[in-house]
Amino acid sequence: MAGKKNINGFPFISFEREYYDSEVMKIRCKYFYTFMNERRTCRNFSDKPVPKEIIENIILTASSAPSGAHKQPWTFCVVSSPEIKKQIRIEAEKEENESYNGRMPDEWKKDLLPLQTDWKKEFLETAPYLIIVFKKSYDYDTAGNKTNTYYATESCGIACGFLLAAIHHAGLTALTHTPSPMNFLSTILNRPANEKAFLVIPVGYVAEECWVPDIKRKTLNEVSQWF
């Protein structure tokens, strides 16, 4: 049972972690790396239903992420309504069409060639769920008073990492989608002025036939410096 104490007028509880010897830790972290390294961005989803409880637990995991001053500056909007998904697809494809046919510089489009992406986003309707993460630039307390958030962008980024790991752990697949601009999402989902769309994540089972680019991740030496 956790111990409790008061520090400068604020409640604290004791914190302990299960201890593993170094050999067990090596096995655990190697297993987790191997498992996470199997994760791939997917654009081909099955429309097979996913139990709501699975999505709820995935979101709870994401919301366990650390955040600036523990303000938890996020809202996870879950869309399963076919009508709303269709609306989102129509508006997203308008923006993506403009991006692919005018906004994007040639170098960007060249970098996307190995991924073979285009402005058509059928996965926004096929995936059983869209999880749309909104970032709160400020918030309100229970009395309705405006309150600050801190490092909201970084906090939401960390939460999205937790979210993607939880999706993969559940046996589902996902895609990180960022139509730009994303203001239409606030309108469709009737979000308050303090929330701004941060990321669109279609979630579901992988389609029976799914192809992903044969690309490689950078090596440890390429992504780390040791001092």
What do these predicted regions represent?
Residues M1-C42, S46-N57, Q87-I90, E98, ...:
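N-terminal accessory segments that position/regulate proteins before the catalytic core
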Residues A2-V24, R28, K196-F227:
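C-terminal helix-cap and adjacent tail motif
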Residues I58-S63, S137-I188:
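Small-aliphatic-rich amphipathic alpha-helix that forms the alpha element of a beta-alpha
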Residues T61-S63, P114-W119, L185-T187, C210:
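Glycine-rich, charged/polar anion/phosphate-binding loops
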Residues S63-A69:
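Glycine-rich phosphate/pyrophosphate-binding beta-alpha loops
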Residues A69-S80:
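Short loop-to-beta-strand entry elements in the cores of soluble alpha/beta enzymes
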